[in-house]
Curated annotation (Swiss-Prot):
Induction info: By ethylene. Slightly induced in leaf blades in low light intensities.
Domain Fe2OG dioxygenase, first and last residues per copy: 211-310
UniProt binding sites for 2-oxoglutarate: R301
Family statement drawn from the similarity comment of this UniProt entry: Belongs to the iron/ascorbate-dependent oxidoreductase family.
GO molecular function, one term: 1-aminocyclopropane-1-carboxylate oxidase activity
Annotated source species: Arabidopsis thaliana (Mouse-ear cress)
Cofactor(s) it depends on: Fe(2+)
Name the record gives this protein: 1-aminocyclopropane-1-carboxylate oxidase homolog 10
């Protein structure tokens, strides 16, 4: 088979997949026993690259208790966040004040939406650019090769909140309640991160890191051959900060010291990761690192990611490394950017081999 005929076959497979309008879940509901070739990932990419002897390595993503942030131990919390942001780019937080009932309801509402009749879900397909809630069962079909094993929906929360009626009834109240708590927790985290940089606690808020928020909710159906594909290919986030709620299934991995490290679910915890914009404005002090999701064979996996970013809203603000972090010994490493400009290029190259952020290095 020639390369050209392979491309034609793939395009035909994609066209058929799109026409069903049932997403990856539709494949599973049809009781397929083999993963279609358009989802296949080379085995070299799927490898964890982990040596047999890891006794000398710290491969545990930090877990930070935020319960002491308003006590005399605040500096201890800040120190832990600083270390995690500098060395991992990822950490989990507990005692974050988001009620467990709210966490459980948003996960259940994401499940409800994705497991309802496709006819209902398809009302939210991306037919125009003005929708505040979009169902993406073909989120990256023409940009990702191979395809990812997931279905998703996106909801744009801030700075321009959607009308409640724009959010499907299956998840409306849960989305509104959960994102309210996420905005409150985001304000706390940006204060702590500001202090971890040695700056005034309101610094990151003042430059509008908290201004924009959108959520991306993934449903990963059980995969008959999980060793052949990925739920999400490796990538970094085009955000200042991302808050992720994952269920107890597992599958999230972060690249640390060239190894893919599991981020095990911790009941009641939220995963926090540094985004590209934060790495840029901190001049590489905080790291935006690659991460991915492995599918599983037994049960669907749910995740709820909230991105602090105004990347999909008009925003003329110019961002560059924060001046107070620079010196003769630590000059600016990045050019100035606007968020929309960066996002356009990021989305066009999201699954490239190298981080898009490298394009803005001086």
């Amino acid at each position: 088979m020639t390369e050209n005929s392979e491309k034609i076959d793939r395009l035909n497979d994609l066209t058929t997949f799109i026409s069903t309008k049932t997403g990856v879940k539709g494949l599973v509901d049809a009781e397929i026993t083999e993963v279609p070739s358009m989802f296949h990932v080379p085995s070299s990419i799927l490898s964890n690259n982990r040596p047999s002897d890891i006794s000398g390595l710290n491969l545990t993503v930090p877990i930070i208790d935020l319960g002491d942030r308003n006590t005399s131990s605040r500096n201890v919390v800040i120190s832990k966040i600083k270390d995690a942001a500098e060395n991992w780019g990822f950490f989990q937080v507990i005692n974050h004040d988001v009620p467990l009932t709210v966490l459980e309801e948003i996960k259940e509402s994401v499940r409800r939406f994705h497991e309802q009749d496709p006819v209902v879900k398809n009302q939210y397909l991306p037919t125009d650019n003005n929708k505040r809630f979009v169902y993406n069962n073909d989120f990256d079909l023409y940009h990702s090769s191979p395809l990812n094993w997931r279905d998703s929906f996106t909801c744009y929360i801030a700075p321009d909140p959607p009308n409640p009626e724009e959010i499907p009834l299956a998840c409306r109240s849960a989305v509104i309640e959960y994102t309210k708590h996420v905005m409150e927790l985001g304000a706390v985290l940006f204060q702590l991160l500001s202090e971890a940089l040695g700056l005034d606690s309101e610094t990151l808020k003042r430059i509008d890191c908290l201004k924009g928020l959108f959520m991306l909710c993934h449903y990963y159906p059980p995969c008959p051959q999980p060793d052949l594909t990925l739920g999400i290919s490796k990538h970094t986030d085009n955000s200042f900060l991302t808050l992720l709620l994952q269920d107890q299934i597992g599958g999230l991995q972060v690249l640390h010291e060239d190894y893919w490290v599991d981020v095990p679910p911790v009941p009641g915890a939220l995963v926090v990761n540094i985004g590209d914009f934060m790495q840029l404005i901190t001049n590489d002090k905080f790291l935006s690192v690659e991460h991915r999701v492995r599918p599983n064979k037994d049960r669907p996996r749910i995740s709820v990611a909230c991105f602090f970013s105004s990347s999909l809203s008009p925003n003329s603000t110019v961002y560059g490394p924060i001046k107070d972090l620079l010196s003769d010994e630590n000059p600016a490493k990045y050019k100035d950017i606007t968020i929309p400009e960066y996002t356009a290029g990021f989305l066009a190259s999201i699954f490239d081999e190298k981080s898009y952020l490298t394009n803005y290095m001086i």
